[in-house]
């Protein structure tokens, strides 16, 4: 059976359209230039002399740089390693990576926010942006029946829901383990705009440095810049051969790596200045220390979130997650309690997840924003051009044969809903403010209530203290007088008693003052008061 003409033509012409893949990259060495850090822990708080593990002789190691200035090479060609495109070229400047005349490799794109001065990395990025815009233009301006934009590939790129949920769950677990308040109702927020990542230095007591790494690819260069460091004390610092500041008081431990390229396990980074590195080439003049990286999340309580949405003039500062959990780490280190294991393991797990997800999440968000901006600009340009080209046929809608060909922006509905919620909250805030002095007092009650009890106790003590003291003094005085009255008869019984003679009775009618008598006889209380007379009668 004979093949159709168009199938036969396609079969014949197919080899002419086959694209040739770039040659493999030659930035491979077999003399073991790559060595790893391995810290062996004898017991918590003591680090053995750092050793390093080299690959066996003949093991190929691929090395690529994340940034290469334009003045380091005259020409660059594409190469491929592990199904990834790289640039390769010979260095013409002694200060460039590798040295003069050495062939090195670097990534196809440089990291976000960097420029190589108009070199191949900038050109590749500009070419990629033009290709995306051209593809969107072709999809939108096709003359076939209008089917809308196909964003399925973009949706596959932006599937970050699972990674974000895992990141939030890990954060909440670590917060419950190290926070003394153990919050149950809170909001953990991750900003959509770019904010610096937070660096948490690795504690010296951490004993998880013995993980073996098997990798044959090394990326030399900063991965993240403009870091925010939580604290700069008790650091585990790295000392290279050309490190200038080796007496820094911030470092509690110094380790010396080998002179070749060194890399750290997944989840741990070198922090030099305000940049984070996965691998270093064995030379750094600035001080570098070991650190975790965590995203800039913010924790809100319900009241804090309400205050933030209402936008009051003075809002209470909310704690940032790394500082809250970092306080738990520092408290555990200072007091010797068992929080160091949970907090550092949490940081390690969170940093590991961030190590694999931060670039994908950031690239996805940037890609979405760039493509939406490009799509809006391209749609406006194409629509104006199509209206001009199809003006004689009644415009774009009649030319395409559709009743409605206008894009309805649904973001306006979301904006209206958010505005309604803000207006509702604002009305509630105004009602609270219009309730009079109690409205203002209610705002300060959470701050005043903890001090009302001690303040009232002090005032009551100052008012009624003197009265109570006087009552106590009078009570004690009365008790003393009563005791004295009870003791007075006993005291009188011990005094001397006087009597008159019994043989001279006084006249019942006579006055006491008229009686003339001699002084009474003095007798002792021990003698009887009545004595027998001379006749022997009593």
Swiss-Prot record:
The chain crosses the membrane at residues 444-464. Residues 1-20 form the signal peptide. Residues 465-484 are annotated as: Essential for the fusiogenic function. Keywords: Cell membrane, Cleavage on pair of basic residues, Disulfide bond, ERV, Glycoprotein, Membrane, Signal, Transmembrane, Transmembrane helix, Transposable element, Viral envelope protein, Virion. InterPro entries: TLV/ENV_coat_polyprotein (IPR018154). Belongs to the gamma type-C retroviral envelope protein family. HERV class-I W env subfamily. This is Syncytin-1. It comes from Gorilla gorilla gorilla (Western lowland gorilla).
